[in-house]
Amino acid sequence: MAEKITSRAQDYSQWYIDIVRFAKLADYSDVRGCMVIRPNGYAIWEKMQAALDRMFKETGHVNAYFPLFIPESFIQKEAEHIEGFAPECAVVTHGGGEELQEKLYVRPTSETIIWSSYKKWIQSYRDLPILINQWANVVRWEMRTRLFLRTTEFLWQEGHTAHATETEAKEEVLRMIEVYRHFAEEYMAIPVIVGMKTESEKFAGAHETFCIEAMMQDGKALQAGTSHHLGQNFAKAFDCKFQTKDGSLEYVWASSWGVSTRLIGALIMAHSDDKGLVLPPKLASRQAVIVPILKGDKAAVLEKAVELEKMLKAAGVQVFLDDSEQNTPGWKFAEYELQGIPVRIELGPRDVAAGKCVVARRDTSEKETLEIDTAFPQKIKDLLDSIQTGLFERALRFREEKTKVVTTYEELKAQVEVGFAVAHWDGTPETEAKIKEETKATIRCLPVSKDFATKYGINTEGKCVFSGNPSKQMVVFAKAY
């Protein structure tokens, strides 16, 4: 029940854990660092999968599946890649009761195993581009774990594409980060900053990494998706060449991009409150619940409740009727608030007699009485749209309130305690590392979002907030998950 939840003001970390557990989204596993995604949590992931998969296919991608196990020799082919992932890898040394001749790495990411196949599939420019996505699980041996945000095993999608030119590969990288931005803002109702990672923060083995960064309610950043320009690194590692139109041989250009179940963590931390989970309707598997108040003429109330359920389902609303009598209506109200059901419809004997019902919205807790007529389903759909829009606008207002341009190092140190600091940086890894060491804040990205860049004057010259050296562009500093 909702009263068990620790308040955000009291302990934000415990509040998050309480919501994950009490809303029955996930639970701890007996396997260290792993989690059990419960039906309520998996239903959100299925909604995310469906929306993203549709967008991937609309942009020309197809799904495939590659092995979970990767030979050690494959991992070692790309030096930067293995250096970046080796500490996180789980390694299989025995199988069938015997020591393996070659160790097998449990997939931390799939570039190497996929490019071993691409080498076989690509001979000519006619074989390009290859636009493949994979839905899979990956394993990274995390030392400090938190449900959804950082676990040893997690679910994700990873896109891997092969192209004839660098221009095409770069276009793919930017196309897919835009897909992620659209998904975050239109489905998750979370405003994000699109940007490029610094050299020290980019993906191991990439030329460039683009990202979307979101702000959580404690002012910290969460990287919600990445898209990598891999250049020809993996093609060279696997000697993957193609014959061009003029007959010459060239290495293939590549991209990779991915999001994971940490998006569920982002969803929780961006919107939820001290009563429990708050879900944007587009990602809620149950958008509305009908709670009949079964006293007086129970039969009439139930009959009208069933009629309402049919009306709403026919209109495409994902609604369910809770006509159980084990729990009181008040218990149900609190429970469905905790579970984040966007709309609650209350129906009692007086409502039935008046031809009306009470409708409560989860995001603001506002209630209104609506006529039960032919327009009722559309009113509920409009309400769901209003909740979706309202959540985004509220999150955007919050981010803007917690984002500040700073011109001194003292200002930066104070600002990263509450939100995002936009500041000039001299472009050196030494300055970046020193700021991280002293403040625990990292450069989240070099923003490329036009609206954000314009609002905060990103592309202006100035002096580095730390060193005082010349700076060509401002960046976003924040503490992060």
UniProtKB/Swiss-Prot annotation:
UniProt keyword annotation of Cell inner membrane present: no
Main location: cytoplasm
Gene Ontology MF annotations: ATP binding; proline-tRNA ligase activity
Location(s) in or outside the cell: Cytoplasm
Recorded superkingdom: Bacteria
Reactions the enzyme catalyzes: tRNA(Pro) + L-proline + ATP = L-prolyl-tRNA(Pro) + AMP + diphosphate
GO cellular component: aminoacyl-tRNA synthetase multienzyme complex; cytoplasm
One GO BP annotation of this record: prolyl-tRNA aminoacylation
Protein EC: 6.1.1.15
Keyword Transcription regulation belongs to the record: no
NCBIfam families (UniProt xref): proS_fam_I
UniProt protein name: Proline--tRNA ligase
Source species: Chloroherpeton thalassium (strain ATCC 35110 / GB-78)
